[in-house]
Amino acid sequence: AILNKKSILKTVNADYKKYKLQIIYTQITRDSNGKPSFKNYTYKLDSTNYFYCASLVKLPTSILALEKLNELKIDRTALFFTDSVNACQHKVSKDTTSVNGYPSIEQYIKKMFLVSDNVAYGRVYEFLGVDYLHNRLAQLGYKNMRIVHRFDGGCKGADNTTTNPVSFYNSDLKLIYKQKEQYASKTYLHPLGIVKVGKAYMNAQN
């Protein structure tokens, strides 16, 4: 097993309770028509322990963003501009990766899934707002899930739960919808209490 091939992983696996080791692996198999099927494998999974899902949060934020657009009757290709209300936030009105040169929720979601783009995730997170995000997750049965910060740096602490003013425009740059900055109505503490488990990470070069 891979956990016994590298000495550092072998050490962690030997004392998995101390290191709070948990692994979730999803195998994707495609049939002759390219249709995927998924099979999950877990190792030492414990719902009472904290599990940091990292970029996996890009999936629920993308789904909820599309759902919110549908509620607002806004097309996913509408031009999406981001303003700022404090120094750590970013103003965005251009996107050189899109065909028309403008950002949109659709383009941000494409970038999240194609290259796991953290900046794109930050803009979608800001559109949703922390309260909307957690209220909807709770309604869907994910009461213990916490998504409370951007991944592109800059904002810290409470600033991470203050989300930018955003606006949508049609192709003629006519305003469709405007959303003011949003402030979290409460502090979203983790239901498992203290969840700090380390201060570093390893990658393929380690």
Q: What is the predicted role of each segment?
A:
Residues 50-55, 126, 206:
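Aromatic-acidic/polar surface patches that form glycan- and anion
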Residues 51-80:
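Active-site SXXK
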Residues 22-26, 60, 81:
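Soluble periplasmic/extracytoplasmic beta-strand elements of cell-envelope proteins
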Residues 2-6, 18, 99-205:
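Active-site-adjacent helix/loop patches that line small-molecule binding or acyl-intermediate pockets
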Residues 66-74, 85, 113, 129:
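Generic short alpha-helical segment signal, independent of protein family or function
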Residues 71-101:
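Short, glycine/proline-biased beta-turn/loop segments that scaffold the active-site neighborhood
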